[in-house]
Amino acid sequence: MCHGLIGRFFCTAFLCLLAIYVPVARAQTGAGIEQTFANSLTTIPTENLSVSGAFYVPAYSSVSMSQGKTRADFSVTLSIHNASETRPLVLKRIAYFDTAGKMVENYLKAPIALKPFSTVEVFVPTTDVRGGTGANFVVDWAATGEIAEPVVEALMLGGLGSGHYAFISQGRPIKAVGKN
């Protein structure tokens, strides 16, 4: 705690410096995925992508509590795991939608390919409440042949008062084309 006039001055100065030098949390962009997870990526296969699918992943960036009188905001980390030991997984779309079903953000400008057993993530900070209480992701994927189904999950972290919460939402397949 800061006591006295001098203590308040130093406390205020420290908080101002902290505000200047600590980066603001922002939602991750498509370029951020490619740069942050460069070691998880490989070149897009030249063969025909004969197997494809899509996952729907609920993502609770906000949750109503106390009969709707209180709202708890959560950070969301979407993790997309290539569960194949042998084939790359091509991600064609990672889209974030709000409660009304309107697309908030598309995280890929172009398809990317994950190495076998690799993972990429998308982070939505607690301060980004554009998704609301019914936010969700849709992840479109493809592969050159039979492949282990990707594992797609969202981890929500947040708190309200002295309580802290963490929970996971698993993606559900909503589309499959080709033999898998």
Positions of the model-derived regions?
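Sec/Tat signal peptide C-region and signal peptidase I cleavage site
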Residues: 21-27
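Short, solvent-exposed loop/turn segments enriched in Ser/Thr/Gly
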Residues: 70-77, 135
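Intrinsically disordered, low-complexity Pro/Gly/Ser/Thr-rich segments with frequent PxxP/GP/PP motifs
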Residues: 98-136
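Terminal connector regions
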Residues: 30-34, 40-41, 128-180
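Asparagine-centered strand-capping/turn motif at beta-strand->loop junctions
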Residues: 80-87
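Short, hydrophobic/aromatic beta-strand segments
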Residues: 87-94, 105-107, 149-151
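Bacterial N-terminal signal peptides
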Residues: 10-21
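Transition segment at domain starts
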Residues: 36-70, 167-180
